[in-house]
Design a protein with these regions (language model features):
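Long, highly charged, low-complexity intrinsically disordered interaction regions
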Residues: 1-12, 20, 24, 230, ...
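N-terminal cationic and glycine-rich segments that engage phosphates or anionic surfaces
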Residues: 128-131, 137, 393, 409-410, ...
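Accessory helical-bundle/CTD segments and flexible terminal tails appended to RecA-like ATPase motors
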Residues: 513, 532-542, 549-556, 561-564, ...
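N-terminal pre-Walker A segment at the start of P-loop NTPase domains
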Residues: 263, 267-277
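Upstream accessory/linker segments immediately N-terminal to the RecA-like ATPase cores of bacterial MutS
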Residues: 73-264, 668
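Inter-lobe coupling/hinge segments of SF2-like helicase ATPases
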Residues: 275-278, 286-607, 671
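OB-fold nucleic-acid-binding modules
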Residues: 37-68
Length: 698
């Protein structure tokens, strides 16, 4: 048996009780799990401070001396505060505990010399260390101690007496037990070319570094390895899919595309749109299945690019579908496509949950006999009973509302899978896109169509409602429409937020002359659709809503987005909401309304929003503030985000390096049959077996 797979219970210092806590709280079940539970920071322990040198704001420090005496203070409810008065000959401080008196009196003795490690604070004009680490000075070689590792722990662990220091000791016990070098998981040609230290050295140095250089070299090696295998898994999956499924070959740019380009194109394409259309055309003409992600802010012209891609499919004798996340967005796409294709002899139909009876049969029959060229719908399109004559291209709008499983269902509609174009207005940072949508090629539309004015974003405090309401009234009197967004539907007992229902009533009193709609997440879909339709058709001037309006709808006449309690929203969410306006030729505004109690992080979010409209710049900032697991879409991606040491937000260069190296391997050994790569394929198999998320896309 591999010693690294040994049950953690059998490690000296663990036992059955600690085993259960480590497993439940940290997911540590084996020696390997403990080795791969990495420190989150280090403190230099080569320096010993004098008590006279201590300061109130110092980080963790160590002092050396002896205990003068013990003292106990009754805190009531059978609790005691135990204080040891400690001196190093240059001053006196206190060591403080709030429990564990038996252990303290049994293990620590007056006049014996100890090394104390902890964070100093001041109490009653004297420095104290609360629950410090204490070591016998005679057993420590202070000059050789190096860096002290710190490990994250939970409250339950602390109550059970398992601290960062405990994990440090357990890890030390394990490393001393592992006499033989730990097995290598990267081939020599990679470690030598990239100047990486061995896995054996990295795992030992990450837990017991002597210097900062040790920690950095260990981290680079372990981060690279982790990211490399994530990328190898994704790229192998994509390679397997390409070899397994032969894509349709669209060789023709025919009359439908040319007619549209010559007669119906509403405005000159931006350079970004032209570039993306070329990328899509190259994919669909390669004979391999296209899997492409198209990113672009709201209003950047993604739908037009998708339509021109659909016309290439139609010119080659194939059907196409466009899937949207909601019925109202599907209806809007249908209307947009019909306007674009006016006068062209193409049959376009809608297929959503509301299409029933005779009409539904007409549509399903038209898909089977091939008389329908383009179908627009919701997830109803991927139902098993919906069949196509020859589906050649599937366009999916707002990918994160669907997910990998739904995308895979489309592949089963034909003998060969259709080309796939995924569109999203949620900006995805480059490093994250490589990981979430690693099996997709990425295109970006980073220009707005001509004539669009950048949205002006303004920050107002909630005490400035008079000027806010005056601005709203002025815009509506100019013929525009306004969104007003609330963060919650029901009041929280702990957080005082505006309630949409009471807010709606208050706004009706402020604007009695205007008609208003409201939508929120607890309404039935039909109610939401009806209210939204009133606003889309211009029958209401103000739409009061929660964040359910993030996705989709296109109301060019809406020129103002007011976001109340904007401090409660993440950056990407604020940007998505802002993208609902700015779709017409008129100047649009986004008003971020907050209270005066703003944290430093909230101020940064507001400042970023007010200073840039660049979705990718915002997404990068959001990734650094929140981490990848919190970003919309990552949970449905099928990619693991429980990275143990790498950080996608901060390790962008390593992500790119790992992808480049993984791509070289796939290019050199697409069928995973070359013996020189056996180490990699065997390790990847181990990781897939151990990680449910990886297996889900494999």
């Amino acid at each position: 048996m591999d010693i690294l797979q040994q049950d953690i219970m059998y490690l000296t210092g663990v036992g059955p009780h600690r085993k259960e806590i480590l497993k439940k709280e940290l997911g540590i079940s084996t020696y390997s799990d403990l080795l791969e539970y990495y420190p989150y920071k280090y403190v230099d322990r080569t320096k010993v401070y004098l008590i006279s040198e201590l300061g109130a704001n110092m980080p963790y420090v160590q002092i050396k001396g002896h205990i003068l005496s013990f003292e106990e203070f009754d805190m009531g409810r059978r609790k005691k505060r135990i204080v040891a008065h400690f001196t190093d000959g240059h001053g006196v401080c206190d060591l403080v505990w709030f429990n564990g008196s038996q252990y303290i009196y049994k293990n620590y003795f007056i006049e014996k010399e100890y090394v104390i490690f902890g964070k100093p604070s001041i109490y009653n004009q004297r420095f104290q260390f609360t629950h410090p680490d204490i070591d016998d000075a005679s057993e420590l070689q202070l000059n050789n101690m190096g860096m002290q590792p710190f490990y994250n722990t939970t409250e339950k662990m602390k109550k059970a007496g398992i601290t960062s220091h405990t994990i440090e000791k357990l890890t030390k016990t394990l490393i001393e037990k592992l006499v033989e070098p730990l097995p290598e998981t990267l081939p020599n040609f990679i470690t030598q070319r990239l100047h990486l230290i061995s896995r054996n050295d990295a795992l030992r140095k990450i837990h017991y570094p002597v210097s900062i250089d040790d920690t950095q070299r260990a981290q680079v090696r372990l981060k690279f390895e982790e990211l490399f295998y994530v990328q190898l898994n994704i790229l192998r999956y994509a390679s397997d899919q390409r070899r397994k499924y032969r894509g349709y070959y669209f060789k023709t740019i025919g009359k439908q595309f040319n007619w549209f380009y010559t007669h119906n194109l509403p405005f000159e394409l931006t350079n970004a749109q032209k570039r993306v259309i070329k990328e899509i055309r190259a994919d669909m003409g390669s004979g391999k299945q296209m899997n492409r992600l198209l990113q672009g802010d709201g209003g950047s012209g993604k739908t037009l690019v998708a339509l021109m891609s659909m016309l290439i499919a139609v010119d080659n004798g194939f059907q196409t579908c466009l899937m949207a996340p909601t019925e109202i967005l599907a209806e809007q796409h249908l209307q947009t496509l019909k306007e674009f294709l006016h006068g062209m002899n193409l049959r376009i139909e809608l297929l959503t949950g509301i299409v029933k009876g005779k009409k539904r049969k007409e549509v399903t029959d038209g898909l089977i006999d091939g008389s329908i060229h383009i179908v627009v719908g919701t997830h109803a399109i991927i139902e098993d009973k919906i069949q196509f004559n020859n589906l050649g291209l599937a366009v999916i709008d707002e990918q994160h509302r669907f997910g990998v499983a739904q995308r895979a269902k489309l592949w089963k509609k034909n003998e060969n899978p259709p080309h796939i174009l995924v569109m999203t207005a949620t900006p995805i940072p480059r490093t994250l896109a490589m990981t979430i949508y690693g099996d997709l090629d990425v295109s970006v539309i980073d220009e707005l169509p001509p004539g669009r004015k950048p949205i002006q974003t303004i920050h107002k405090f909630d005490t400035q409602t008079t000027s806010l309401y005056d601005g709203i009234r002025k815009q509506i009197n100019l013929g525009r429409q306004v969104y007003i967004v609330f963060p919650l539907i029901k009041e929280s007992e702990k957080i005082d937020l505006k309630n949409l229902e009471s807010g709606y009533e208050a706004l009706k009193e402020v604007f009695p002359e205007f008609k208003m709609s409201k939508i929120h997440g607890q309404m039935k879909d039909k109610e939401k659709e009806a209210e939204m339709k009133l606003f889309v058709e211009g029958q209401t001037q103000i739409l009061v809503a929660t964040t359910v309006i993030e996705v989709g709808v296109n109301v060019p006449n809406a020129s103002v987005m007011v976001i109340l309690d904007a401090q409660r929203f993440g950056l990407s969410q604020l940007h998505q909401l802002r993208g609902r306006v700015g779709r017409g030729a008129e100047q649009s505004f986004c008003i971020l309304v907050t209270n005066h109690k703003l944290t430093t992080e909230t101020r940064r979010r507001i400042d970023i929003m007010c200073n840039t409209n660049d979705g990718f710049e915002i997404a990068e900032a959001d990734l650094k503030l929140r981490g990848p697991g919190d970003l919309e879409g990552t949970q449905q991606s099928g990619i693991a985000f429980d990275l143990k040491i790498a950080d996608i937000a901060r390790d962008g260069q390593l992500v790119q390096l790992a992808r480049d190296e993984a791509k070289k391997i796939i290019d050199n050994d697409p069928t995973c049959s070359k013996s020189e790569y056996n180490l990699l394929w065997n390790r990847l198999k181990e990781l897939r077996n151990a990680n449910i998320n990886w297996g889900a896309i494999s």
